[in-house]
Amino acid sequence: MKPSSSNSRSKGHAKARRKTREELDQEARDRKRQKKRRGHAPGSRAAGGNTTSGSKGQNAPKDPRIGSKTPIPLGVIEKVTKQHKPKSEKPMLSPQAELELLETDERLDALLERLEAGETLSAEEQSWVDAKLDRIDELMQKLGLSYDDDEEEEEDEKQEDMMRLLRGN
């Protein structure tokens, strides 16, 4: 084993070394300098407190007092109102073409077949069917057509046939 290089005195309680006058004066000056720095930094009330100088603008909470940077007009400017452009309207079909589209509508045909079969339609489907049938009636009136034309022609033919029979022709 090697003998320890430390002194046997170091193992016990070490005596406190007295500081020289110069060291005491230097420590006093350091304490005074630290005491002067106590308190808040100048302008801390307006600056918002603890802000680190190294991370300005990064991950710092945004000050609510700083507003928008958009320019504000200082003079009186007349407000220009934008006129609404109407949405592209459906191209107007002739009444004849619209009537043909409604008569060949597969959904309308399917719903009418369900009604004839005795099924009940939901309120939405029923209102849709009613609206389409009303539109068909309007178009037929515009065009001078009616459902009764076919029936009237048949009745007229029957009456003519009866008249021929009565006359003996």
Curated annotation (Swiss-Prot):
Assembly mode: Interacts with Der.
Signal peptide segment: none
InterPro entries, per the entry: YihI (IPR007336)
Domain of life the protein comes from: Bacteria
Biased composition range(s): Basic and acidic residues: 20-30, 160-169
Annotated function: A GTPase-activating protein (GAP) that modifies Der/EngA GTPase function. May play a role in ribosome biogenesis.
Pfam families cross-referenced by the UniProt entry: YihI (PF04220)
Biased composition, class Acidic residues, residue ranges: 147-159
Keyword Cytoplasm among UniProt keywords: no
GO molecular function, one term: GTPase activator activity
HAMAP family listed in its UniProt record: GAP_YihI
Annotated Polar residues bias: 49-58
Keywords noted in UniProt: GTPase activation, Ribosome biogenesis
Region of interest: Disordered: 1-75, 144-169
Stretches with biased composition (Basic residues): 10-19, 31-40
UniProt similarity note: Belongs to the YihI family.
Gene behind this protein: yihI
Any one GO BP annotation for this protein: ribosome biogenesis
Protein name in UniProt: Der GTPase-activating protein YihI
